[in-house]
Curated annotation (Swiss-Prot):
Binding site for heme b b566: H97, H196
Function: Component of the ubiquinol-cytochrome c reductase complex (complex III or cytochrome b-c1 complex) that is part of the mitochondrial respiratory chain. The b-c1 complex mediates electron transfer from ubiquinol to cytochrome c. Contributes to the generation of a proton gradient across the mitochondrial membrane that is then used for ATP synthesis.
Compartments where located: Mitochondrion inner membrane
UniProt remark on cofactor binding: Binds 2 heme b groups non-covalently.
Binding site for a ubiquinone: H201
GO molecular function, one term: ubiquinol-cytochrome-c reductase activity
Matching Gene3D superfamilies: Cytochrome Bc1 Complex, Chain C
Family annotation (PANTHER family): CYTOCHROME B
Superkingdom as given in the UniProt entry: Eukaryota
Organism per entry: Enhydra lutris
Cofactor: heme b
Membrane topology: Multi-pass membrane protein
Full protein name: Cytochrome b
Length: 379
């Protein structure tokens, strides 16, 4: 008798995705981040659901409803901080996941990669709208500044911004619709993640060497289920440590001041995970140019497969490309730091240089270096 796991229509899907899935025998801990992102998403949906039970999306009561969650709801404080810091963990995992894809050439699976880019944009949109909901100073002014960027679009810009706001400024209508979108988007992300997995399982996983591993596959369970549990425990440990010891470490103190349209905070800045893109936006003096650079800073990932000039897939055996990759990482950390600094003399120039270097590495230096490496190997 065949195992029900392999025959039942529902369990068959789970079996082929998580149990009997043939996986390369040499994938490292860098391949853990997919499952960690799944855990983050589930955690965010659950904590978000419980927060939504007590939150009110009205400008007069939003701020006090968040205070009520933290003060009066049973364990409300831990749910709120798990959700806020869970977003940070989500983005840490996302950046590492994308970095892994760049390093090991996983972008050669074009459908999986492109859906991943759509997922990245969707998660960023969700996080931005979530940051507006507590209706603190940084929520209000962050929403005002970022939505205002759309006014740079020629001809329709101003109408588009007012349409998104639902009025002539960020107000009650904006908060209500942002809450609605923030609630629905994680479910859309879940659906996209399933499609992401569907396309991945069409090709099978890449591996650190970048060499096809069809001749050497092992079942996903128990090998990688155990490995993923280790990653999950590490993630939960990091998150609970952050939540219980320094829950406001990654937040902005200005968001503990209720939103006031009449007083602008001295430094308007987004959450830390958007700072690199914010720095690129600010480094261009022209408004439309800045908005385009902001979008392209993420959208550039879509043309990475077209710029792959190396005869090898992975960077494992390409030391020159490795140097460039880590230079890119350092550059992104520099941009993140600059995004949190005021617009003053040394920071402006550093931000402009780091922005130029970011696009230079991805568009020019990496393809040229790959060609040089091919020639060095006489390929």
């Amino acid at each position: 008798m065949t195992n029900i796991r392999k025959t039942h229509p529902l369990t068959k899907i789970i079996n082929n995705s998580f149990i009997d899935l043939p996986a390369p025998s040499n994938i490292s801990a860098w391949w853990n981040f997919g499952s960690l992102l799944g855990i983050c998403l589930i955690l965010q949906i659950l904590t978000g659901l419980f927060l939504a039970m007590h939150y009110t999306s009205d400008t007069t009561t939003a701020f006090s409803s968040v205070a009520h969650i933290c003060r009066d709801v049973n364990y409300g404080w831990i749910i709120r901080y798990m959700h806020a810091n869970g977003a940070s963990m989500f983005f840490i995992c996302l950046f590492l996941h994308v970095g892994r894809g760049l390093y090991y050439g996983s972008y050669m699976f074009s459908e999986t990669w492109n859906i991943g880019i759509v997922l990245l944009f969707t998660v960023m949109a969700t996080a931005f709208m979530g940051y507006v909901l507590p209706w603190g100073q940084m929520s209000f002014w962050g929403a005002t500044v970022i939505t205002n960027l759309l006014s740079a679009i020629p001809y329709i810009g101003t109408n588009l911004v007012e349409w998104i706001w639902g009025g002539f400024s960020v107000d009650k209508a904006t908060l209500t619709r942002f809450f609605a979108f923030h609630f629905i988007l994680p479910f859309i992300i879940s659906a996209l993640a399933m499609i992401h997995l569907l396309f991945l399982h069409e090709t099978g996983s890449n591996n650190p060497s970048g060499i096809p591993s069809n001749s050497d596959k092992i079942p996903f369970h128990p090998y990688y289920t155990i490995k993923d549990i280790l990653g999950a425990l590490s993630l939960v440990l990091a998150l609970t440590t952050l939540v219980l010891f320094s829950p406001d470490l990654l937040g902005d103190p200005d968001n503990y001041i209720p939103a006031n349209p009449l007083s602008t905070p001295p430094h308007i800045k987004p959450e830390w995970y958007f700072l690199f893109a914010y720095a690129i936006l600010r480094s261009i003096p022209n408004k439309l140019g800045g908005v385009l650079a902001l979008i392209l800073s993420i959208l550039i990932l879509a043309i990475i497969p077209l710029l792959h000039t190396s005869k090898q897939r992975s960077m494992m055996f390409r030391p020159l490309s490795q140097c460039l990759f880590w230079l890119l990482v350092a550059d992104l950390l520099t941009l993140t730091w600059i995004g949190g600094q005021p617009v003053e003399h040394p920071f402006v120039v550093i931000g402009q240089l780091a922005s130029i270097l970011y696009f230079m590495i991805l568009l020019v230096l990496m393809p040229i270096t790959s060609i040089i490496e091919n020639n060095l190997l006489k390929w």
